[in-house]
Structure formats: structure tokens, C-alpha cells
A protein has these predicted regions:
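An aromatic/glycine/proline-enriched structural segment found at the starts
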Residues: 1-44, 145-146
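Active/ligand-binding-proximal structured segments within catalytic/core domains
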Residues: 38, 47-60, 69-72
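Short, charged, low-complexity patches
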Residues: 49-53, 57, 65, 107-111, ...
Length: 178
């Protein structure tokens, strides 16, 4: 026989209070290398700003051609590793920049150089070559991810949870509209 479906409970989660000031936490330990993490708030998955933050994180720290790697590792030799990624999903997320300082580099020296890279990104329009390169990488990563049945099923479930399973077919258009 048929099993009747149950009622779907309303998902009501409180939003985190708005952060209005800069916060930092310094932890000192005896470790092989000094690590840093910068976290910036970003919109939830349903917001177009989510996709802009995703592209920005790729421009900043996806690979060896990224802005942070080129400037802070290759040119200035301030870090031994650096990257950027996002944590967003249903709720507001974070764009995180993290890595490890080279020996002898102070956090203040690194911080100044990092903010110079971020200010340049903020104040200058990204050229078409860089944007095209990022879009190709995003499309390629998505196509490889979609080859596996489990990944396709998980992505479909994610979009259904967001309220529109067809969003899986429309997401690439959002990226290309940036």
C-alpha cells in the first residue's frame, strides 16, 4: 500500500547577529609556521552575490595564477602557501583567505601587502582575459564534478533544498552573467 507523506516542518533558523566592527583573534603557540585566516561575510546561495564571491575567491586564491599567489608568494615571497575559498550554502557564508607566512615575515608586513592586493581588486575592473580564464576553470570544475553520479545527486538535492531543483540547470547562467 501507499505510505502517506508526513508534513514538512518549517525550517526556522535564527540569523547570526550583524557584525559591525572588525574582530581579530591572535593565538600564539610553538608551531612550525605562522598561519593566518581572514574571513569576510558573504551572501547565501540564493543571492547573486554568492556567485560573485565565488568568482572573487577564485581570482584571489584558486591556483598558482591567482592574484594572492602571484603577488604575495611569487613576487614578494611573504608566504609559503596561500589560498581563498568560500563556505556559503543555505545561510550567509564566508570568503576565507588563509595560508602560512614565510619564516621572518611579520603579520603586520603580510597584512599590509594583503590589503594592497584586496584594494587593487576592489578599485580596478577585472580584465576580460582574467575573467574568461576564471569562467573556463569554473565550467571545467563543474563539468568534472557532474561526471560522478553521487555528485550530481548531491547537487540536485542541494538545489531542491534551496527550493528549486531546476536551479542545477540554471546555475551556469548566473556565473556567466557576472
Amino acid at each position: 500500500g501507499e505510505i502517506p507523506s508526513g508534513s514538512k516542518p518549517a525550517r526556522v533558523l535564527e540569523a547570526e547577529p550583524e557584525q559591525k566592527e572588525f574582530r581579530e583573534k591572535l593565538i600564539e603557540r610553538n608551531v612550525p609556521a605562522d598561519a593566518f585566516y581572514y574571513a569576510f561575510k558573504m551572501p547565501e546561495r540564493k543571492n547573486a552575490g554568492y556567485y560573485m564571491a565565488d568568482v572573487l575567491s577564485d581570482a584571489l586564491g584558486r591556483d598558482k595564477s591567482s592574484r594572492l599567489y602571484a603577488s604575495l608568494k611569487k613576487e614578494q615571497k611573504l608566504v609559503s602557501e596561500i589560498g581563498a575559498y568560500i563556505t556559503g550554502s543555505l545561510d550567509n557564508g564566508l570568503l576565507i583567505i588563509g595560508g602560512k607566512l614565510n619564516e621572518g615575515v611579520s603579520f603586520n608586513m603580510f597584512d599590509k601587502a594583503l590589503w594592497e592586493v584586496l584594494e587593487k581588486l576592489k578599485n580596478e575592473i577585472m580584465d576580460d582575459t582574467e575573467l574568461d580564464r576564471l569562467m573556463i576553470k569554473i565550467r571545467t570544475a563543474r563539468e568534472f564534478q557532474e561526471q560522478g553520479l553521487l555528485n550530481r545527486a548531491m547537487n540536485l538535492c542541494q538545489f531542491e533544498l534551496l527550493g528549486d531543483a531546476n536551479g542545477i540547470n540554471e546555475e551556469h547562467e548566473i556565473y556567466y552573467s557576472i
